[in-house]
Design a protein with these regions (language model features):
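Carbohydrate-active catalytic/glycan-binding domains of CAZyme proteins
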Residues: 1-146
Length: 146
């Protein structure tokens, strides 16, 4: 099987991740949903997955994620606002963003204004639940050793 972990399209602002599986690279992928478990921020623990590593000599996978704008934490309200704003661009008759919400969006770190020199990384292990990748928040953990 081939697995894919994805991020939405909100520039440097974190968003909900997705996971998908396929029998091969040539077949369609089927969505498995958000791999982040109990993520109250709805923003992938305020990060965007950029790479998955296998710990050499083990079966353990580690997700490395960028936290581009650590000074701009995303909570469920902000996540909803960004999701609606992006959706409204493609389906304006279905999704709506109020003028005050647009102002809030315009005050967020944009591609031109985000200070990415402050970026951090989030490293979390991937566990498997019935052939689905799951990522839990852990304040502290150690990788498996061979």
């Amino acid at each position: 099987k081939k697995y894919m972990l994805t991020s939405g399209m909100s520039g440097y602002i974190p968003n909900r991740s997705g996971s998908a599986v396929s029998g091969s690279w040539e077949e369609p992928f089927v969505s498995l949903g958000n791999p982040h478990v109990n993520d109250d921020s709805r923003a992938s623990f305020n990060s965007q997955i950029s790479k998955v590593f296998r710990v050499e000599g083990t079966d353990q996978l580690i997700a490395m994620a960028d936290r581009w704008v650590p000074d701009y934490p995303v909570d469920a309200h902000r996540a909803d606002l960004f999701e609606r704003a992006i959706a409204a661009h493609f389906e304006p008759e279905k999704y709506h963003v109020l003028p005050e919400e647009k102002r809030e969006l315009m005050n967020s770190p944009m591609l031109q204004s985000a200070n990415t020199s402050k970026a951090l990384y989030v490293w979390l292990p991937i566990r498997w639940e019935r052939d689905r990748p799951k990522i839990d928040w852990l304040d502290c953990w150690r990788p498996q050793l061979p």
